[in-house]
Amino acid sequence: MAAIQVKLVRGLAGCPAAHRTIVAGLGLKKRDSTKILPDTPQTMGMIAKVSYLVEWERVDQPAPEGRKARKAKAAARQG
């Protein structure tokens, strides 16, 4: 599955509160922070709404696993 790399290129000062919420939903906190997200219509819709704040590109790297999957793997490793 393809993934999308999103980078916050502008600060959030002066942005509407709704756009700040969307950026937080993408997992971006500070300027120049980067996240790799799954390529879904929901993600692309969020990116479209804040396109003036972010840059994005498709990458072949798989999207990171969810928190539950990581915890399950860690528990399996510990025995």
UniProtKB/Swiss-Prot annotation:
Single biological process term from Gene Ontology: translation
Cited CDD domains: Ribosomal_L30
Presence of the UniProt keyword Ribosomal protein in the record: yes
Superkingdom to which the source organism belongs: Bacteria
InterPro entries: Ribo_uL30_ferredoxin-like_sf, Ribosomal_uL30_bac-type, Ribosomal_uL30_ferredoxin-like
Keyword Ribonucleoprotein in annotation: yes
GO molecular function: structural constituent of ribosome
Record-level GO cellular component terms: large ribosomal subunit
Pfam families hit by this protein: Ribosomal_L30
UniProt KW keywords: Ribonucleoprotein, Ribosomal protein
Family membership: Belongs to the universal ribosomal protein uL30 family.
Assembly, per entry: Part of the 50S ribosomal subunit.
HAMAP family: Ribosomal_uL30_B
Protein name per its UniProtKB record: Large ribosomal subunit protein uL30
Protein's organism: Anaeromyxobacter sp. (strain Fw109-5)
